[in-house]
Design a protein with these regions (language model features):
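Hydrophobic or amphipathic alpha-helical targeting/insertion segments
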Residues: 33-81
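A short loop-to-beta-strand structural motif that recurs across blades of beta-propeller domains
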Residues: 60-62, 162, 206, 314
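Structural motif
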Residues: 53-56, 106, 259-261
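Beta-sheet repeat architectures centered on beta-propellers
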Residues: 1-19, 23-45, 183-198, 204-457
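Generic beta-strand hydrophobic packing signal
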Residues: 59-61, 75-80, 94, 148, ...
Length: 457
């Protein structure tokens, strides 16, 4: 299995510790540890350098670096220390921007951002932990900082009720903070991500974007979540009770945001997924994933990996497998796709449905269930029972990995159509496809409905 190394060690030598000395050090206490923010500086080392700030705002930023070669941790040299930004300033947020470490959100200085000296190369003895050297400084804003993000040439500063950008951080004569808007703020810094060339974040009135324009240095605000405004409204109304986390799955062009209370159950944890399509964002909800922290990136082979962690300290491979495993226990995944109510262009005509054909894109063997409801689920008219669809197998390619005769299905399409006869009639109808099992994932591509008009009133 995987090997874990605790990195918050105390009294590490300035020149670094070998593996034996480092693992033998006492633990560096992280008082009131809460959700953390990570900043990674690639630098000149093989493994980069990492800075960790804590939203509990009870500790200084933690700095960690590892050097050396070889596949075993025992061949490495380890560096660890706490960063003194300014006295007892304990920032909550951190980011690397244009050769600087930038931090903000300290409880004692909520309106102030601090930036380190300029990071150029090792010959200048540049140090991520130095907030007093050449090029370092601080700026006080008019609003409380809730998040920071490097975006193109600017540092975007998200505040409670406004958004700013920091320009020319490396030019002392022209460094400036310019307002983007003083009417829109960010509800939680952990919602900020970059996807499709834009920044997205959770605001009081929805998921908003900050996008670059054709004009150099110009940005514009947009809104992309009108379809799920009721969900966003409920989330925004209670945002202070939730732990927010978010990430971007690049291979799927998806923005994912999760929210749950500090003591809530995994089963009750929720989230939203925004997928970029040619027609803009398409949205869905998640249930049963407790992600108090989540991250996505590429491994050494260029393969995207995503992990999340829950309140009990379990780390999970995200978006993999056919079932959830909260605390190591296999649990069904509940999936549901709901259509609007269709009147087929004439709400006054009663329609008798004969059958429907549904296009799926399965990732393995699946057998979902279909539910048809008439006239906005009117309880005063007969509603048909649920239909268990025919089992759908993943199509196989001859010679493919894991393909065996008498087991794999050959000659099938990647997006099979399933025909299901249905009963009932109404002026409108809706369809729900759902499953509660440990079978493979699937996408619903579309419907074909065959019906006959059966009267008008």
């Amino acid at each position: 299995g995987d090997s874990w190394l605790q990195i918050n060690k105390d009294s590490v030598a300035s020149g670094g510790d070998n593996y034996s000395t480092f693992t033998g050090r006492s633990t560096l206490a992280r008082t009131s540890q809460d959700q953390a923010t990570f900043a990674i500086y690639e630098g000149l080392t093989d493994y980069g350098e990492v800075i960790i700030t804590d939203r509990g705002s009870g500790v200084k930023p933690l700095y960690f670096k590892m050097t050396g070669t070889g596949s075993a941790l025992s061949t490495r040299t380890f560096f660890c220390e706490e960063i003194t930004v300014s006295g007892t300033v304990y920032p909550k947020f951190c980011v690397i921007h244009d050769k600087h470490l930038v931090v903000a959100g300290a409880a004692t200085a909520p309106n102030t951002i601090y930036y380190s000296n300029t990071l150029l190369d090792s010959s200048n003895n540049d140090d991520l932990t130095d907030f007093t050297g050449t090029g370092s400084g601080s700026i006080v804003l008019d609003d409380q900082v809730v998040g920071i993000k490097s975006f193109r040439d600017d540092l975007i500063i998200f505040c409670s009720n406004s958004i700013y950008k920091l320009e020319n951080i490396n030019v002392s004569a022209s460094i400036a903070v310019v307002p983007i808007t003083k009417n829109v703020g960010c509800l939680d810094g952990n919602s900020i991500q970059e996807i499709g060339g834009d920044l997205v974040f959770l605001s009081p009135d929805g998921i908003r974007t900050i996008a670059g324009t054709a004009r150099i240095g110009d940005v514009e605000l947009g809104s992309v979540s009108r379809q799920i405004q009721s969900i966003i409204g409920s989330l925004a109304a209670s945002v202070d009770t939730f732990r927010i986390s978010s990430t971007v799955l690049r291979s799927k062009s998806q923005y994912r945001l999760f929210y749950s209370t500090a003591t809530g159950t995994t089963a009750g944890s929720k989230g939203i997924i925004g997928t970029i399509t040619p027609n803009g964002f398409e949205w869905s909800e998640t249930l049963g994933i407790q992600a108090h922290a989540i991250t996505s990136g590429f491994d050494k082979d260029g393969v995207e990996k995503t992990y999340h962690g829950d309140k009990d300290g379990y780390i999970y491979v995200h978006d993999d497998g056919n079932y959830f495993t909260p605390a190591g226990t296999a649990t069904n995944i509940t999936a549901e796709y709901q259509t609007p109510n269709y009147d087929f262009g004439d709400v006054g005509t009663r329609k008798t449905l004969l059958y429907t054909r549904i296009s799926f894109s399965p990732e393995g063997d699946i057998q979902p269930t279909l539910r048809v409801r008439y006239d906005y689920e009117d309880q005063n008219i007969p509603q048909p029972g649920d239909y268990t669809l025919s089992s759908i197998s993943l199509p196989a390619i001859f010679g493919g990995s894991g393909v065996t005769f008498n087991t794999a299905v050959f000659g099938a399409t990647n997006d099979p159509m399933v025909r299901q006869a249905v009963q009932g009639s109404g002026n409108t109808c809706s369809f729900r496809i759902f499953s509660d099992d440990q079978k493979a994932s699937y996408a619903v591509n579309g419907f074909y409905v065959d019906y006959v008009p059966s009267g008008r009133r």
